[in-house]
Amino acid sequence: KTIQLSEIIVGNSAAYIQKVYDRIKDNLIGNYTIDFFLRNVLKQEKETIVLQDLSGKKNQNISSKDKISIEILNMRKVKLYDKKEGIDFKFQNFEEISNLVAPSPSGCNFTEIEFNDENYKKIEFESKNKNTQGLGIKGYLVINKKDLAIVEFKMSSDIDTDLLPYSKFMLSKVKYRTPEWNKHIKFIKDVASNKYYPVSLKMDVKVEVVTDKKSFYFNNSIDLFTTSAPRDEKIIPNFSTDKDLFKAKFIYSADFWKSQNQLPLTKELDNFLKLVADKKDKTKEYEVTGNF
């Protein structure tokens, strides 16, 4: 039976959400390893300036001090740095990417919305109040009614930019702030363990930069997805999970990237690589960093 989207259902959704939170530990796999691919793209306004693709293994162990461990197997990356700009971008790390901050039952308003599958609930949330810097959140959760497991989660910024302050780079007049961000995670159930794990994650961040001459935006998009079922396997960690993603240093394998089909080069990215090739010898104006 298909339920059509219709009016808002008003109820005690905050109490229901607390029950969902109480089941998280039982619903999620505690210790497992998966294979993953990750794409990291940075644009300055609409122009791509960074491409980074990774493949590897991720171990998640909630009982360990290092809850996440990463073994990178393959990487290709390139960055086109315009020296006259004099501004670089700090990327997220694996801990920040994987971190899931649940909306507070007491700090948010929750509203159940009719969903197109009667086996699930969709509950939207938003901050009751923004803080003094204009920061708030909004988003939704999709929940399996049978076991109270979260199968989809999206959280976005809800910011009053009139109140949002700028930060400054040290010894510089350049200032910056983050007016927009969002994170979208999907979970599926592992057949063997009958528990859930995140199968895909997308994170987008928009950073506003203001100099004495102009203002512009950096737009960073990170996509991480799994390509295997969870398994019991020890990995050999070779990259710190609290380190800027782009600081990873691994040898490029042309054979691997030509044969894989998980992260194809779009026309836009292919044009970016051609642009890098055209400008890589203009060392006075540009600096190219990469492994291929």
What residue spans do the PLM features occupy?
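Surface-exposed, low-complexity/disordered segments
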Residues: T2-K121, Y166, V174-F292
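Feature captures eukaryotic membrane-trafficking machinery centered on endolysosomal pathways
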Residues: Y120-F169, K175-D190
